[in-house]
Amino acid sequence: GRRVSDTVEGDRRVARFVSKQPILGFFSVQSAAYEVARRQHGGVTLEIYYNPGHDFNVERMLDAMEAALDYYQAHFGPYQFDYARIIEFPGYASFAQAFAGTIPFSESIGFIADNADAENIDYVTYVTAHELDHQYWAHQLISSDQQGSTMLVETMAQYSALMVMKQLYGEDNIRRFLKYELDNYLSARGSEAIEELPLERVENQGYIHYRKGAVVMYLLQDRLGEDRVNEMLAGLLDKYRFKGAPYANANDLVGGFMSLARNESERELVNDLLKRITLYDLKADNAKVRKLADGRFETRIEVEADKFYADGEGRERKALLKDSIEIGLFTQKPGLGAFDKGDVISMKRYPIRSGSQDITIVTKTRPAFVGIDPYNKYIDRNSDDNIVATE
């Protein structure tokens, strides 16, 4: 809320805050000798409270808040406060957390982060966008206390942050974010103490609702359409905004995605990503290029593809893969710092089936690299073999 009084009573300082909007009984208190950076944006006062000398990323955070608010208000509805605050706290812990219009943010993951190297993930912007989105998913819409509840909180914030990153960095630079999330999910699966659950039944398992959730949501919006997904999510927010029981649950979200599926292939994809534990094994090999008589280049790529279903203890069985998956041709390897959309020669979906198959593509430019699912949108057990240099 807004500070309405600040007095000293005896030896105690007393500050009183009042919110004009409904909030949860869920808040935090930070008090320090802060510097404050402010910016006005669309009727909202953006504020960063930081330790003097820790201004390295303050402007980046303010820029991220602006970009996130613009995206969320355009697609999800009005932001409920006339302020948004980020408050630095010491690096005794490395997290940020969203309270009502107020985000405590560890110095170690934001304020003293080094983002100078283009090869690094801009996690300052990523985390800022994620936490600001919780003003919608957690503070406007509250999920029921049952399996799958964090899908409506953390997975939605991951999705929203990725959409902001896509808008800022472009579709062709999103691979580094997706690969980071994918690799973290895959490595964490082996440390599961009880049972891995499908996303729709996740039980506060961070590697599922954060890491897997980010990759799953990105693929769903890619296949079903970002605008269509956002329209469905906005409808869900409208239905439950600031309401008490009965609260939203994972069935609302899964049903929403299923309603967007236009054919059997898309329905199968929704089931695979949300209701099952599904793993893919996609590999590119033997990419050979020859110059044609008309000056164009013919690229022939060998693709190996498989799909597996796993149970909660990691036992796998093969499943039939029948999908349309992107094949990309590039002048530079995707994911590197210098890579951008100018390095993309061709990016199209092709029918992919279980097993080995050859795909032939003709382009005007000679590719240096070819890959299947080159931006790591699928839960691929080994994403390092998706891209291969041409011969």
Indicate where each model-derived feature is located.
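Hydrophobic helix-coil surface modules that form long, contiguous segments used
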Residues: 1-129, 159
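Amphipathic alpha-helical substructures
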Residues: 78-80, 206-301
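Active-site-adjacent structural elements in folded domains
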Residues: 88-91, 118-123, 143-144, 195-205, ...
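Active-site His/Glu-centered metal-binding helix of metallohydrolases
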Residues: 128, 132-137, 156, 160
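Catalytic Zn2+-binding segment of zinc metalloproteases
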Residues: 132-148, 168
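Acidic/His/Gly-enriched intrinsically disordered linker/tail segments
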Residues: 150-219, 223, 240-245
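Beta-strand-rich binding/interaction modules
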Residues: 229, 263-267, 279-352, 357-374
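Short acidic/polar inter-strand loop motif in beta-rich domains
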Residues: 334, 374-388
